[in-house]
From Swiss-Prot:
Keywords: Amidation, Disulfide bond, Ion channel impairing toxin, Knottin, Secreted, Signal, Toxin. Residues 1-21 form the signal peptide. Disulfide bonds join C31-C46, C38-C51, C45-C58. This is Orally active insecticidal peptide-3. The lineage of its organism: Eukaryota, Metazoa, Ecdysozoa, Arthropoda, Chelicerata.
Amino acid sequence: MKTSVLFAILGLALLFCLSFGVELEETGRECGGLMTRCDGKTTFCCSGMNCSPTWKWCVYAPGRR
């Protein structure tokens, strides 16, 4: 009984890690959020964000959509 509960918990943890990795891989190809590295040529920021020319990361830009 204890062993089966342990295997169930480990299985759920493994499933969570795999799904998180797949989701992270999918979002890696999209736009960058706050404090995400950008260069304005190949990597871009999401709406509401602007690529800072000084720091080369996405910063909040009020008024930009």
